[in-house]
Amino acid sequence: KKRHEMPPHIYAIADTAYRSMLQDREDQSILCTGESGAGKTENTKKVIQYLAVVASSHKGKKDSSITQGPSFAYGELEKQLLQANPILEAFGNAKTVKNDNSSRFGKFIRINFDVTGYIVGANIETYLLEKSRAIRHARDERTFHIFYYLIAGAKEKMRNDLLLESFNSYTFLSNGFVPIPAAQDDEMFQETLEAMSIMGFSEEEQLAILKVVSSVLQLGNIVFKKERNTDQASMPDNTAAQKVCHLVGINVTDFTRAILTPRIKVGRDVVQKAQTKEQADFAIEALAKATYERLFRWILSRVNKALDKTHRQGASFLGILDIAGFEIFEVNSFEQLCINYTNEKLQQLFNHTMFILEQEEYQREGIEWNFIDFGLDLQPCIELIERPNNPPGVLALLDEECWFPKATDKSFVEKLCSEQGNHPKFQKPKQLKDKTEFSIIHYAGKVDYNASAWLTKNMDPLNDNVTSLLNASSDKFVADLWKDVDRIVGLDQMAKMTESSLPSASKTKKGMFRTVGQLYKEQLGKLMTTLRNTTPNFVRCIIPNHEKRSGKLDAFLVLEQLRCNGVLEGIRICRQGFPNRIVFQEFRQRYEILAANAIPKGFMDGKQACILMIKALELDPNLYRIGQSKIFFRTGVLAHLEEERDLKITDVIMAFQAMCRGYLARKAFTKRQQQLTASKVIQRNCAAYLKLRNWQWWRLFTKVKPLDEEMEAKQNLERHVSTLNIQLSDSKKKLQDLASTIEVMEEGKKRLQKEMEGLGQQYEEKAAAYDKLEKTKNRLQQELDDLVVDLDNQRQLVSNLEKKQKKFDQLLAEEKNISSKYADERDRAEAEAREKETKALSLARALEEALEAKEELERTNKMLKAEMEDLVSSKDDVGKNVHELEKSKRALETQMEEMRTQLEELEDELQATEDAKLRLEVNMQALKGQFERDLQARDEQNEEKRRQLQRQLHEYETELEDERKQRALAAAAKKKLEGDLKDLELQADSAVKGREEAIKQLRKLQAQMKDFQRELDDARASRDEIFATSKENEKKAKSLEAELMQLQEDLAAAERARKQADLEKEELAEELASSLSGRNTLQDEKRRLEARIAQLEEELEEEQGNMEAMSDRVRKATLQAEQLSNELVTERSAAQKNESARQQLERQNKELRSKLQEVEGAVKAKLKSTVAALEAKIVQLEEQIEQEAREKQAATKLLKQKDKKLKEVLLQVEDERKMVEQYKEQAEKGNTKVKQLKRQLEEAEEESQRINANRRKLQRELDEATESNEAMGREVNALKSKLRRGNEASFVPSRRAGGRRVIENTDGSEEEMDARDSDFNGTKASE
């Protein structure tokens, strides 16, 4: 089957992403999303396995350690990439109700590839580890796998080292041992250790990790109890604490003290605060969660370090995202909000890719398309969660509440409801179980969140006393885990959360820690940026049922998931739109075979060609659209075209195969015919041979022919021996001649070398003289430049002084303006002070009125108390009225107490305002005097400085006139020096020209010396070659003589002679081959010898048995000797030519020497005259320089004087500037003081307003109390009249009984009266 006909497969998606990355050079990402248990982690592992096989750089190597099949092989990096998952699963996965291997964290695996497609590294980022699972989990669930692996798989020695116990001994393993079907914890423990070893974890690191895991379990066994008489917590048994401290390397006493009585910084003081049992338990649980989280982060960084150790550069990457899907539980907390927020962002990316970008491409390509709104805009829900302000979202409000004093989860929800109550995606549940609940409408449905403990989770507080201990642990691994303790929220910061004296608590200061929400939001933002910069490939994992059963499909559940994640809408747009598209050039190239005759020959635009092809294919116009750069098709059209193309290609291939088979059959037939003809020829030849083999003359001919060939070969060998002897003698003579020639040439070479050394010394002396003249010229030029620079500096100084005079005048004018401004400000401050005095007097009068009202209320209170005592001692039938009077009395007493406290506060505020008024008056007087003194002193100083500056200006004018005169003298001297310098330059140029001519002559001589040297080397090489050839010729001659004697002695043994001749022929061939590097004549001789050897072989075979060939061989050898003698004559003539060339070179050398001597003489004469003239010029210049030096000294003295004066002026100006700055500072201080006084006056006004409000309130309460008092007086008068009419005899006992009843009633209804008093006070407060 073809790929598009196959059902979807995770390998196909991974392969598509991998191929797209290589072809398009674009980064890819694979997003695995879905519910818990849907298979996200398994699909992620399958993708990594596939890429490790396809993109491995060790495909040809065998590796038996980790193989997924008989043909799979991985390199070290690929093995580590595969083994990263088991480690992360052991520490980050757990068994839940829905999934036996549920990932309790999200991860983004980034695999880097080089330009060839091989894996060069990887990196893993994690999100939202559910660290709370380390301390508690639901029923029938497990905590992280590593705890069970460690207890089940540790051996005896490890159990003793890590202080391990059974499953039921640990509080954090509340459900005990919960097995997982088809998984053994002890085997998984060994697999985890092996994976760590492959990742490069040392044994010490593995043991340190397991120690931390064991310490987390032991933390859960620490038990606290509440002491009897106090709320303070105590630790009756510290066995578990001792085990924890032993495992993490800290002192148990310090650990216990840090938990039970930690040190907290309050202001500048450090105090010890006793913790309650609940606080101690919370600290231990927070420490366990933080320890496990830090361990997980350390393992992740260690894994990333192992995966990124290669130094090869990554060209592109493929990212795999495995993150928790949308979660709706019975109780949804902060973790669920973060997970659902992440899924909202991912779903928005999916919608944007599938719907928005798809339809935008239709519009961009100019296709007629009505934009379809699929109703999947998730931006409102995302803004509800992440919006920073106007109005702030959930995360921003949570961060704000974390820093707000006395903030609670309830206040956070209330503020959220007030800010976002009208948001379409926010709802408040109708039936509230708790005041910390709210609802958000996500794309997958409405989710009810419970904000309980959200502030704590967002702050993630820890006991900083314990973290400091862990940071200083004796165990290096533990200390490394806790190295960043400065970013921890400590107990003192949490204590400040409950104080009201924290005005700036809602603002996060620079350098302080960042909340969990902030960090996760930034991390998610980086992830989304990475995903947007890649080409996404979505893998939607669908869970078939919630029962973990295979083969069962819950249709409603599957459809709900497809609806929530946008798959149904994606199918809809695929059906309505044109999901398949292909660029014009590719469409033409691929499907032109279907319309071969539709496109004419020659160039044609790609779009026009595609239109012609579509017409030829007769496609329905509803099935395609032609855009600007692509052609779009509906679903299935391209597949149909692909099938037709396959059929067409099949027909073409079949026709091609038929032609090939016909050609091969015809070729085989022709070959068969040729074989038949050849067999007939062979048959005829065999018949002829059978007739000849019995003929006697034929037998004689076959026996005689080999003897003739052998005799001819012997003759050729003899001739060759004689020729070689002659060559040997000639070569010896040539060798002697060349040796003498080489000796003569070596002597000439030595003589020339000595002459060259002498010339070199002379050249160096002349170069030194020239350099000396050049230095003298440069020194004079430098002195001249210095004088010019000094003149420019003097001009600059004068101009600077003039500018400073102008600036000083401007400063004086500015100072006068500032002094006038200060006077105006002083007047305004005095006016404000007088206004505040009047306000303070009005406040004092208001206070006196309040005191009088207070005294009047106290008198009224005393009167009421006396009347109450009389009424209590009255008759028992008035007990009920007395009880009501007692209640009103208590209410009045509470009112009196409140009024008394308010009066005390008013008195304190009045006293504070009086103190502020006095301070203001004192400050105003001091400022006034200071301003007047400063202004007077400044005016005097300015006048004095103005006079000094005028005097200095006159002095500068006189000095400037002197400077102008000196400048004119210096200009004249400069012109004179420039003329002298030009003369020196002309003389130096002539010397340079002479020097260059000498250098040219010297270079010519050096070139001739090199030629002589080259010729001498050639002669030596030829001599060595001749020596070598002569030795070889001697050897050859000796061998040929021996062969000649042997042939003369035994001519009858023809066969043996032929073999010896063959051997000698091979030796001669080797010797001739070794002489390939000889001269041209010897090479010609070699070729002739090879031809002779071939001829000897032929003659030896033809003339075998011929005894007379011996004389012919001798004659031929004589001829060969004559030829060698001729060649020797030519060699001698060549040697004579070489000798004559050498003599000619010697003559040229002598001529050049004579020319060199003449040139040297001329150069010396020129140099002597030039040096004499230059010396005279130098003496003259030295005199001029001395005169100029004296003038320069005088000028420097004047400059020093002027510098001193200038420094004094500058110091004075600097003093003036400092004084101005001081005045500005004083003015600023005065402004700040005035502002402070204004603020104090405003505060005093606010206090007075508040006092007036309190006074009006007290007046109203006093009026009410007066009215109630009058009512009570009327009631008392009525009771007195009743008492007078009563019976006198029964008055005493009834009064006693009534008194007792009144007392009992009072005691019994005390709580009721308190409740009514509180209601009364609340009513007053609301009024």
From Swiss-Prot:
InterPro entries: Kinesin_motor_dom_sf (IPR036961), Myosin_head_motor_dom-like (IPR001609), Myosin_tail (IPR002928), P-loop_NTPase (IPR027417)
GO MF terms held by the record: actin filament binding; ATP binding; calmodulin binding; cytoskeletal motor activity; microfilament motor activity; structural constituent of muscle
The UniProt record lists the keyword Repressor: no
Region (Actin-binding): 524-546, 625-639
Binding site for ATP: 34-41
Bias (Basic and acidic residues): 1222-1231
Sequence ranges of Polar residues compositional bias: 1127-1143
Disordered, as annotated region: 1127-1149, 1222-1327
Coiled coil feature spans: 707-1289
Gene Ontology biological process: actin filament organization; cardiac muscle cell development; elastic fiber assembly; smooth muscle contraction
Keyword terms: Actin-binding, ATP-binding, Calmodulin-binding, Coiled coil, Cytoplasm, Motor protein, Muscle protein, Myosin, Nucleotide-binding, Phosphoprotein, Thick filament
Gene3D superfamilies registered for this protein in UniProt: 1.10.10.820, 1.20.5.340, 1.20.58.530, 3.30.70.1590, 6.10.250.2420, Kinesin motor domain, Myosin VI head, motor domain, U50 subdomain, Myosin, subunit A
Subcellular localization(s) per the UniProt record: Melanosome; Cytoplasm, Myofibril
Myosin motor domain ranges (all copies): 1-646
This protein's domain notes: The rodlike tail sequence is highly repetitive, showing cycles of a 28-residue repeat pattern composed of 4 heptapeptides, characteristic for alpha-helical coiled coils. Limited proteolysis of myosin heavy chain produces 1 light meromyosin (LMM) and 1 heavy meromyosin (HMM). HMM can be further cleaved into 2 globular subfragments (S1) and 1 rod-shaped subfragment (S2).
Assembly and interaction partners: Muscle myosin is a hexameric protein that consists of 2 heavy chain subunits (MHC), 2 alkali light chain subunits (MLC) and 2 regulatory light chain subunits (MLC-2).
The family this protein is said to belong to: Belongs to the TRAFAC class myosin-kinesin ATPase superfamily. Myosin family.
Protein name stated in the entry: Myosin-11
Annotated organism of origin: Rattus norvegicus (Rat)
Gene (name only): Myh11
